[in-house]
Amino acid sequence: GRQLDYFINSGKPYIGYFIVFGTSLVMAIIDTVLLCTMKEKPSLSPAKLNLASLAMPLRDTKYRGFILVLIIWSFTIGLGTPFLPVHLLRNLQLSHTFITAMGIASAVAAMLGTWLWGRMADRYSWQKVFQNAGLVVAAGYICWGFVSKETAVFAAPVIMCAVEGCNGAFNTASLNLQYFESPQSGKTVYLGVTSALANISSVLAVMAGTLITTLLSPIIGEATFNVLLTSSGILCVAVLMTYRLLYKHSHANIR
């Protein structure tokens, strides 16, 4: 972050961006090599799968409702998340150094949050974690809509740490609930299809968010990002309410 600010202020932004890109590329290659060297335990009962198997999660009436909740959640989160860095830099005028520092702090908050939410899951249920962590994430997005240049230095780190401290726990709870809802045989298909559809939903959300910002920017200017982020948070609350209506009792004791 500091080197990026230095090169931008020196009128050589592309050097800073190239350093960031090069570092990220090297780390990605190392990560790929390490993943490829990991040993997997062979499956004791290999399943025979075909293209028709990919439709199994959608045909399963028990699982279909939950996969729909996750698809809509991915869409609502995808509406605002990709535009947050632009909002931080352009509208709130925070430096790359400050944003990087927030990223480090939020990573620490994520580790601490995972431990705290894990204890909550052990004591209560993954449903409680899914709902409560999701509410904090939604509240964070709603709060982004009310952060101004004057309050950004104080409010932005708090919101980012709160959201990241709950985001990992929400995803872990989601995975455990998917595991519970899917049948004993074919869990890989269920989880894989869910992940794929959620990612497709996120891509569509980015396209929708881009269209919204294009239409609203000439009308309300910088407030476009505030509206987009707040709307994303409100929609997240609606998704969580829908989940509660569908699975209030069936997920109550999953640990």
Language model features by range: what are they?
Residues 135-151:
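C-terminal ends and interior cores of transmembrane alpha-helices
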Residues 4, 113-126, 213:
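Helix-to-loop junctions at the C-terminal end of transmembrane segments
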Residues 27-38, 230-255:
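Multi-pass alpha-helical transporter architecture, strongest
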Residues 40-68, 255:
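Juxtamembrane intracellular "pre-TM" segments in multi-pass secondary transporters
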Residues 169-183:
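Intracellular juxtamembrane helix-capping segments at the cytosolic ends
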Residues 153-170:
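Hydrophobic core of transmembrane alpha-helices in multi-pass small-molecule transporters
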Residues 82-99:
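Short amphipathic helix-loop junctions that connect adjacent transmembrane helices
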Residues 4-26, 213-234:
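A membrane-interface helix-boundary motif in multi-pass transporters
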